[in-house]
Amino acid sequence: ALILANKEMIKKINRSILPGLQGGPFNHSIAGICVGLGETLNPEFKEYASQTVKNAQFLCSELQKYNFQIVSGGTDKHLILIDLTNKPLLGKKFARALDYAGIIANMNTMPQEKQSPANPSALRLGTPWITTRGMKESEITLIAAWINQVMEICSQWNELEFADFENKVKSSPEIATIANQVQELCMNFPLEI
């Protein structure tokens, strides 16, 4: 991490975390941070960051069409937190089902969480990778539809224990079809790294 502060604040921070809570400086980490900060000075990065947020906002609006509840009603950054309490699947099962469909998401807790962190009520999605690939609104419309389809397909197995649920998902021809469609979309937007 990088902390920006005045000298007085740095002294207080150092007294509160040294020794034991903070390691020494790692030059490779510092170099990486410097390169990353240098990248942010390019106009292309500003465009990329802006498009990443636009993509997240558009994905929110598309998911809301399928009655997915977005925590806080929307987003102003690259992340989306979906409250799944109105859906049959919660975070752990839904994230795993999406994984088999080729869509990476994280189970996540949310404000006023009533479930355990091991099986939370929410799902977190991010848009940096789809933005890096060059995807925009038309592709996000497809992604939102696939997310909804995965929920609809896998809801029938909600009452199963996790291992049995996972076996149903990974042997589902419908999920395999979505995974193939996701892969085809990604092939049309290859990563240039």
What is the predicted role of each segment?
Residues 20, 24, 40, 44, ...:
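Short secondary-structure junctions and interdomain/linker hinges
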Residues 1-90, 170:
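Active-site C-terminal subdomain of aminotransferase-like
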Residues 69-137:
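Conserved PLP-binding catalytic core of the aspartate aminotransferase-like
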Residues 49-53, 60, 81, 95, ...:
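Generic hydrophobic alpha-helical scaffold/packing signal
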Residues 5-7, 19, 39-42, 86, ...:
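Short, well-ordered loop/turn and helix-capping segments at boundaries between secondary-structure elements
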Residues 117-193:
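PLP-dependent enzyme catalytic core of the Aspartate aminotransferase-like
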